[in-house]
Amino acid sequence: MNSTPANSTPLPPLQPFTPGSSAATPAPIALTRSKPRRRLSSNVVGVSDRRRLLQMLQNVEEVSPGPDSASEAGESPSIRSQDEAHLEHLSSARICMDEDKELLIHQALPAFENTLLRFVQALSKYDFRQDLAETLMETESQFCEAVDELVEHQQAAQTIAALERVSEGLDDKIRDMIRKLAECRRELRNYQPNNENQSTLSSADLLTYATRIANFTTAPPYFRERPEHSKLPWPIEDEMRKGLLALMEVGKDKTELGELADPEKFAHTAANGVAPNGAAPVANGVAQNHNNGYAMERRLSTGYGSDNDGDTNMNGRSGLAGLDIFDDDDDDDDDD
């Protein structure tokens, strides 16, 4: 089997195989053959559960934004979609852990290395074995699947890291919201009114009672305080009410107003009992409206509508009781 034809050129002497020597030239051939097969296996849909897991993880990455994009946008997607994606990813990761306790790369890589080493050693001895070539192709396909699984595992790890960052951000927001809610609750508790000191009477009852007694009650005498500057260049409201203009507004008779303006003119009358200028009749030379003029004069001096008007009309002398010229003992002397 090792005999060579006569017309063939002599071959160089064989060199012992070492991992770093140039004799391992067939290795790149196997790697170049694995590339199209790897692309073919990645394009096939539904080959195994790992392919579906990879597709699902890619969909999760497209749906869930990263922390940078969420911070730039100012708000994150709906909490429901993030929770669903997070639960879906956790369930898929749990399935992978249950099915494969250990990654295939841990078994495929040593098997591929041993098969490749045996194949290279056989080629170095000019002993080409068909079974080693087929075994190398099988181990190479298994190694490609293991590499694909390793890529999926790395992508899943990146997705888990991104979801953990999103979860930490949401946890921070939830803590801030809980802290703010606690502060608001504390403030609202402090702002609650004290029901013990609160009056049980309603405003409607108070208004109804005030309307009922409004026609029978008045304000206190000194309800309105005297203004601070009472001596102003113009008269105050109370003085204007006591004047003649206020009496005219009330509707007094012009004759009575004339008597108030000049009471002496109507106090002295003629002897024949006829009052001049159309005045009221007289008796015994004394005008009858003398007391009325005195009452109006008292009203002007004490104030219009005062409480002393009734007493003055009933007893004309009671208005002069406070004067020095009136002596109560004169009546007693006359009786004696």
UniProtKB/Swiss-Prot annotation:
One of its GO terms (molecular function) is transcription coregulator activity. Its main location: nucleus. The keyword Chaperone does not apply. Residues 154-192 form a coiled coil. It is found in: Nucleus. One of its GO terms (cellular component) is core mediator complex. Residues 1-45, 59-85, 281-336 are annotated as: Disordered. Signal peptide: none annotated. GO terms for biological process: regulation of transcription by RNA polymerase II. Residues 325-336 have a biased composition (Acidic residues). InterPro entries: Mediator_Med4. It comes from the Eukaryota. Keywords: Activator, Coiled coil, Nucleus, Transcription, Transcription regulation. Component of the Mediator complex, a coactivator involved in the regulated transcription of nearly all RNA polymerase II-dependent genes. Mediator functions as a bridge to convey information from gene-specific regulatory proteins to the basal RNA polymerase II transcription machinery. Mediator is recruited to promoters by direct interactions with regulatory proteins and serves as a scaffold for the assembly of a functional preinitiation complex with RNA polymerase II and the general transcription factors. Belongs to the Mediator complex subunit 4 family. Component of the Mediator complex. This is Mediator of RNA polymerase II transcription subunit 4.
